[in-house]
From Swiss-Prot:
It comes from Xenopus laevis. GO terms for biological process: protein sumoylation. Its EC number is 2.3.2.-. Residues 546-641 are annotated as: Disordered. The heterodimer acts as an E1 ligase for sumo1, sumo2, and sumo3. It mediates ATP-dependent activation of sumo proteins followed by formation of a thioester bond between a sumo protein and a conserved active site cysteine residue on uba2/sae2. This is SUMO-activating enzyme subunit 2-A.
Amino acid sequence: MAVIGALPKEVAEAVSASRLLVVGAGGIGCELLKNLVLTGFTNLDVIDLDTIDVSNLNRQFLFQKKHVGRSKAQVAKESVLQFCPDANITAYHDSIMNPDYNVEFFKQFTMAMNALDNNAARNHVNRMCLAAGIPLIESGTAGYLGQVSVIKKGVTECYECQPKPTQKTFPGCTIRNTPSEPIHCIVWAKYLFNQLFGEEDADQEVAPDIADPEAAWDPTKAAERANASNVDGDIKRVSTKQWAKSTGYDPIKLFNKLFRDDIKYLLTMDRLWRKRKPPIPLEWASLHNKENCSEIQNESSLLGLKDQKVLNVASYAQLFSKSVETLREQLREKGDGAELVWDKDDVPAMDFVTAAANLRMHIFSMNMKSKFDVKSMAGNIIPAIATTNAVISGLIVLEGLKILSGNTEQCRTVFLNKQPNPRKKLLVPCSLDPPNPSCYVCAIKPEVTVKLNVHKVTVQMLQDKILKEKFAMVAPDVQIEDGKGTILISSEAGETDANNHRKISEFGIRNSSQLQADDFLQDYTLMMNILHSDEMEKDVDFEVVGDVPEKGPQKPPEESVKNITNGSDDGAQPSTSKAQDQDDVLIVDSDEESPSSSNADVGMESASLKRKLPDEEAVSSTKRKRIEPPVEEDDDIIALD
């Protein structure tokens, strides 16, 4: 071990004695595991739920073609042991969010190192490390950009201390009625996949939206004008999946319904097209007449990289038909009630989305996109670069050595930029910021105000949309602070399922009510103040009032804010950078930029920001017996106003 021999004796001993948790065995994880064992770390635990795909092989060098389909964590362990047989590595093919990996599990480790590609897992590991009191080194890459930061309870900002831009969403009426950008058509195609072959979601409907306020039309009159309600395409208001099943997933009938009849139906909404170019319906028969059939492009005849070619409309129609037939067969093989899950690396699923999206783009007069472009946009993919992962994994180890040497004050958030800044720096270190006193996770008393309509929000929505999605809880328990200890939501299976579809107002929740939400796995408690409003914006179910403010207007010099996602769909790490022209990255600390609020100034994506309740102020986690919701009384109704 050449590296450990060059370390001071005390640090070398700490390295040998330490036990590290590596979360993620992908692009960064492979490089990190290699660096750790070559540095002298021998006691490692690595966890990853993912399996190896062919697309991983160009940069995740611990894997080979023969490993495709196997656990990343297990194969990474086997590969590392080939060049470091003395290492003691434990591999877990599992999700880090599994309740088995509780606070006691995390307390086994000297520190944790994240090599993740999704925000939900990052939030969870952040909270578990705070609860266990161990340092966490966070990291992320996006193309040429990268970042490494250190998180230590009570000393630095936690991962959720600063706001992150939420993933961009689009109004349902835009997706369904008036797409104006290719991404709108791609989102529609992904929704269509789920509506036909996957789990149906009412929020992912693809049929024309007759409730579009911009249309302001008379549906009855329009339906009379539309000569497409019950002919061929059967534009009856049944679910898309029911209709598709009734046709036996006939590709031609699906094509004519989606790209002819539904478009004709849209054209009857006159007002939508007064200032827009109206869509042009497609007809299967006209696309496949003799003249067009001769123009259909055979993939095998395409020169160059076929995934980067844009086909013609007839070819995309043919691709749509072939992919529907393949997916139909996959459903049949799985049996009744089976569902498919869309995966960007599944060829038939990707072909389906590519074809459907491009046909819709053509209908709405947009330039069509290659399969490569559609895949990048559909998966929110920023192509990963092996060199970036290598640089970032090296920086993770350097920060880890600082922690083990007892020099946490020397730790830095380091940004890797695509281009050198005027000072010719590619690596830019910034001082670590102290905890944000307003953070929803690591503040002394986590508390938040949520604005919503108590007469419309259900218990299920409170659990799924607010607590799990917004506040990233895994298994929340919710108690109403009404003096009775009413249990609204229980993490025990089936205990409060009867409440799910009831409005929260039915439980006496009104303006100024307080809810205590506990996640026992994360050792996290959040007090939620309810602010009732009858005037929520359209398509907005709730708002977090006074979301964590960003720290000042500071802006990373020379480089605009970007999101670091490690090539994933929900990103997570800040990116801004400056450059460094020295080979020895250890000297980055000597050339610090002015305080940058490492996480505030960069686009750490999505997720919610929360606070952590310390042990000394933690509310007892003993679950209370569920109490039935109070009987509604007149004064309750008056109080709601």
